[in-house]
Amino acid sequence: LLEQRKAAIDPLKALLYLALATMLGVPTGAMAEPTAPRILNVGYYEFAPAIYTDAHGTARGELAELTRRVARQAGYGVRFRALPSARLYGALEKGSIDLWPGAQGKPELAAHTLEGQHMLSQINLNLYHRAGTPAPRIPEDLAGKSLILIGGYSYWPNINALLDDPGLDLRVLRTSNHLSALEMLRRNRGDYLLDYQIPVEQARQRLQMEELPYQRLTQVPIHFIVSRHARGAEAIVTGLDAAYETLRDAGEDLSLPSD
C-alpha cells in the first residue's frame, strides 16, 4: 500500500517541480544537450589566396576564416562548397547555397539575393600587359588583339560589353589558372591579360616574374551575399551584420587584404 501511494505521489511532485522551475525561470531542459547550430551552406569559387580549397578539401584563406568567425558569432555553423561561378550563381538563385562571401552588385543576382551592409574587402579587375609595351587606349587599342582570361569567371556588364563588341574583333584565350595565364602573357601567347590583382600578385611571386604594368578597369567590393531563397534569409543577413559589428566593436581585427 505504501509503495502504491509513493507511485501516485511522485508524478504529482514532478508536476509541482516543473511548475516551480517555470515560475523561477530555471531552464527545464538543463539536463538536455544544447541544440546544434544551424549550418549555412557557403558557396565560393577558387580565388587564392583569399579563399581556396586545400589539399584536404577544406576551404582556406583569410576570407574563409572571416566567414567562419562571423557566422560563429551569429550562431551559425558553416559548410563550404567550391563551385564554378555559373553554378554558384545558379545555386544562389535556387537557394541550395545560403551564403556567398563575394562581389556586391552582380546584376544577375539582384532579384535573388540580399547583401550585407559591411564591405569585407575590395579587389581590382585589371588589364595587364608586358613590361616595355605601351599602355593600351581602351577600347580602341584592343581591336584585333588577343586577350587572356581565366575560365569560369564572370564579369560586370561594362566588361562583358567590351569582350562581346564585334567591332573590336578580340581573340579571347581562356586558361584554367593564374599561373598559366601569366606564362601565356610572358611567352607572347596573348597581348593582354584580364585578371584580378590579388591572385595575379600571388602567381607572379611564385613565378618570380617582374611586376607587370596594368590599367584598373573595375574595383569590386566584397560583401556577404545571402540567397533570398534561403530559409530565414533576412534573419541571416541581419545576424551576420550584427555579428560583424560585435566583433569589430570588441576590437577584433577583421581586416582582409585589399588591392
Each model region followed by its residue ranges:
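Bacterial N-terminal signal peptides
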Residues: 15-26
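Extracytoplasmic small-molecule ligand-binding "clamshell" domains
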Residues: 33-111, 174
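Short loop->beta-strand "edge-of-pocket" segments that line small-molecule binding or catalytic clefts
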Residues: 38-52, 139-155
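Periplasmic-binding protein-like
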Residues: 44-47, 122-126, 206-244
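Extended ligand-binding regions for polar small-molecule ligands
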Residues: 61-73, 133-135, 140-153, 226-259
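Ligand-binding cleft/hinge of the Venus flytrap
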Residues: 67-74, 118, 143, 155-175, ...
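Acidic, polar ligand-binding/catalytic clefts
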Residues: 68, 80-141, 155, 213-216
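Short helices/loops that flank or line small-molecule/ion binding pockets
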Residues: 86-98, 177-194, 198, 206
